[in-house]
C-alpha cells in the first residue's frame, strides 16, 4: 500500500489556478522528487500536503487515512514533516537546542508537566535530549552541538534542518530544495546523508532544481508545468520524455 496518495489535487487563489488535477502516490522507503520550472506549483503542492493550505478539490491520504484539511501540527503528528528552502533554524540558539525545540510537536507531558517538573516530564526531557544528540550524530553535527546555529555555514544549517525534522520521528519527510545554495562537494555530502535517511526507513519527497542531484538519488519523479503534471516515472523515463525536455530539462541542456 502506498504511504501517501494524492487524488486529483487542485488549488486556486481567486482566479489563479496554482494546481490542477495532480495525482500521484509515494511508496514506503522511496525517494520521490517533484520538479518543474519556477511557478510550476511545487511549493503549493507541499503546502497542501502539510496542511498549510487546504485543496480546492481533491483528497490526500496518508497511511490509509484521509488527511485532507488537517492543520500543519496535525499532519506533523501523523508523521509528515517538512524542511524549507530557506533554513528556519533558531540562529541565536545552540545547534543542540534547535533539535530539542524541534521535538515539541511530539511531547506528551505538556507545558504544565514541564513547569511542575513531574516525573513523566523529567523522563520525557531526558529522552528528548538523548534523541537530540542521536540525531546530531546521524547528520554529522555531533561535534557542533554547543555552537550557535547561526555560526554554521549553509551546508551545516541544511544538515541541522534534517536533524530537526528527523527528531520528531517522521515517516515521511518533505525536503524543499535540500541542496540549494551549496557547492558541488557539499552536494555530494548531502546526497549521502539523504541516502542514509532513506536507508533508516524514512520515506523522502523532495523539491529540487539541481538535476544532477535529482537524477542521482530519485526512485521516481513527478514533473509539473503550470500546475499540471506532464510526466511521472523513473529518472531515465523522465529524462527521455519530450514534454519534460521542452518544459524543464531542455532549458538546462541549453545552458
Q: How does the language model describe each region?
A:
Residues 1-255:
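Glycine-rich phosphate-binding loops of nucleotide-dependent enzymes
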